[in-house]
Amino acid sequence: MNESNSRRTFLKTSSALVGSSFLANGSQKKIVPKSGEIKVGHGEFIYKVVPNWGLLDAGKNPVNDCHEMVEDAKGRLFLLTNEVKNNVIIYDKSGKLLESWGTSYPGAHGLTILNEGAEQFLLICDNTRHQVIKTDLKGREIFKIEYPRETGVYDHPNQFVPTETAVNPKNGDIYVADGYGANYIIQYDSKGRYIRHFGGYSSSYSDQKFNCCHGVLVDTRDPLNWSLLITDRVNQCFKRFTLDGKFITRYHLPGSFVCRPVLHGNYILAACFRSTDASWSGSGYLQILDKNMQVVSTPGGSEAIYLNGILQKQMKDDDHHVFIHPHDVYADSDENIYVPQWASGKTYPIKLERIN
């Protein structure tokens, strides 16, 4: 199942802290936008669009859907696309191509970077292969996680359509979100050996179940109580679980069809591939949430309004049409944001430069 088919199915059914904390207003050098520059965001989190960042020769380095991005210890940016001419494209922060690899991941969807001692590795979720593949940074495959027959809830491999992984930086445990499949979260050890599973699909809302568990994150912001933050996309929320799969609470994001939660210092970043209604094509935007899980900025979308502590419905609000269908967001140590997009005309990622 490729991303487009997975998305149609969705519509029918409708690592340690990365980088430094977002800098407070006034604690970094101001970048004054020039006349005519496009700005997005709210409050202390306003950005200008960097024109033509990352554009490549589409004949040599094409992309299809640009799904996710991560950064390695050398400051290189890894882009995952389901274009089998080069599934992984590696940029420097100026947008220059450094290298590319990968020709065997037709359903490339989820990308996670993990540390093991002095080495780093990648986890790739492939919708079409129904696998999670661990590779080194050059693309050499280390091992594969096949469909989890050990759970007793999967009858055949095609039921397993993983969308995302997260890694516990303490013990290396891997959490796989089967967001386009049976909607379980499956926990493995660092070698890919099954530990447990929880969740499962429900068309009606349930605290313990999901309707498109598209993303998962090990949230390390509370040093004494690490937890899982999991997307429940059709229900427009993140859910918090213990590391062994017990439900804690829900954070409702009305109007926002969120992809995966991304940790950056004390903030959570998220791409919303569509808003208001899942059938509203081209209605995506980004969200930034603080340590209390309150939305503080929505680049490309309407400003967050809270009434009696309850977030009101948000929607697309972008006269410049900066985003079409954002699928992921990554913030670097300079507070700049990179946004790969799904079903957006085979466009390369967008870079946003922090203004304040």
What is the role of each PLM region?
Residues 256-302:
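Loop/turn-rich, solvent-exposed surfaces of beta-rich toroidal or solenoidal domains
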Residues 1-18:
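N-terminal secretory signal peptides and thylakoid transit peptides that target proteins
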Residues 30-51:
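Blade/loop signatures of beta-propeller domains
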Residues 86-89, 93-119, 127:
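Blade-loop segments of beta-propeller domains
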Residues 61-74, 104-120, 150-171, 203-227, ...:
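Beta-rich, blade/repeat-based domains predominating
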Residues 325-356:
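Blade-level signature of beta-propeller repeat domains, shared across WD40, Kelch, NHL, RCC1
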Residues 79-83, 122-127, 176-179, 220, ...:
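Conserved beta-strand positions in repeat-built beta-propeller and related beta-rich domains
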Residues 51-60, 143-156, 195-208, 296-319:
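Surface-exposed loop and turn segments in beta-propeller and other repeat-based domains
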